[in-house]
């Protein structure tokens, strides 16, 4: 790491501590040239995979789209915003854990449906009806029957 005082390349770590619930490392460093001390913080860069849409277009994962789709399905339902955020974080963790650089929208959609199924059955049916393009009332009935199993 370059010294912010003299721009020297050589610095040494004097002290390291975990901060922020263990998600960050705070390091005290000292420049080997000018002997000034400074603090740095390290955070893991957690990269989400790119999303392959049904038309084969690839785009970066968009957490806002995920949140918006879930909130639309959960509109006027008794689910706390904390529960929604936990579900979103779980989906993102699952996507990171795949280790893949790209995932399909189908995979993301299935993860959303799984999360909504656990949060609220009505929201699940709302989302599934749009996601799976239900054509008639029979398809709603079949999906509701599957929920009751």
From Swiss-Prot:
<keyword id="KW-0862">Zinc</keyword>
<keyword id="KW-0678">Repressor</keyword>
<comment type="function">
    <text>Negatively regulates transcription of bacterial ribonucleotide reductase nrd genes and operons by binding to NrdR-boxes.</text>
</comment>
<keyword id="KW-0804">Transcription</keyword>
<keyword id="KW-0805">Transcription regulation</keyword>
<feature type="domain" description="ATP-cone">
    <location>
        <begin position="49"/>
        <end position="139"/>
    </location>
</feature>
<keyword id="KW-0863">Zinc-finger</keyword>
<dbReference type="GO" id="GO:0003677">
    <property type="term" value="F:DNA binding"/>
</dbReference>
<dbReference type="InterPro" id="IPR005144">
    <property type="entry name" value="ATP-cone_dom"/>
</dbReference>
<keyword id="KW-0479">Metal-binding</keyword>
<feature type="zinc finger region">
    <location>
        <begin position="3"/>
        <end position="34"/>
    </location>
</feature>
<dbReference type="GO" id="GO:0045892">
    <property type="term" value="P:negative regulation of DNA-templated transcription"/>
</dbReference>
<dbReference type="Pfam" id="PF03477">
    <property type="entry name" value="ATP-cone"/>
</dbReference>
<dbReference type="GO" id="GO:0008270">
    <property type="term" value="F:zinc ion binding"/>
</dbReference>
<keyword id="KW-0238">DNA-binding</keyword>
<dbReference type="InterPro" id="IPR003796">
    <property type="entry name" value="RNR_NrdR-like"/>
</dbReference>
<dbReference type="GO" id="GO:0005524">
    <property type="term" value="F:ATP binding"/>
</dbReference>
<dbReference type="InterPro" id="IPR055173">
    <property type="entry name" value="NrdR-like_N"/>
</dbReference>
<comment type="similarity">
    <text>Belongs to the NrdR family.</text>
</comment>
<dbReference type="Pfam" id="PF22811">
    <property type="entry name" value="Zn_ribbon_NrdR"/>
</dbReference>
<protein>
    <recommendedName>
        <fullName>Transcriptional repressor NrdR</fullName>
    </recommendedName>
</protein>
<keyword id="KW-0067">ATP-binding</keyword>
<keyword id="KW-0547">Nucleotide-binding</keyword>
């Amino acid at each position: 790491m370059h010294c912010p005082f003299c721009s020297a390349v050589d610095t040494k770590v004097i002290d390291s501590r975990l901060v922020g619930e263990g998600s960050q490392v705070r390091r005290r460093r000292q420049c080997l040239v000018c002997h000034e001390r400074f603090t740095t913080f390290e955070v893991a860069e957690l990269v989400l995979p790119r999303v392959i849409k049904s038309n084969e277009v690839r785009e970066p994962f968009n957490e806002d789209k995920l949140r918006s789709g879930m909130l639309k399905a959960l509109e006027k339902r008794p689910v706390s915003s904390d529960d929604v955020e936990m579900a979103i974080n779980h989906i993102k963790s699952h996507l990171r854990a795949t280790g893949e650089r790209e995932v399909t929208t189908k995979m993301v959609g299935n993860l959303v449906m799984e999360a909504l199924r656990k949060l609220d059955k009505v929201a699940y049916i709302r989302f599934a009806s749009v996601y799976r393009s239900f054509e008639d009332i029979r398809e709603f009935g079949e999906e509701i029957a599957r929920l009751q199993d």
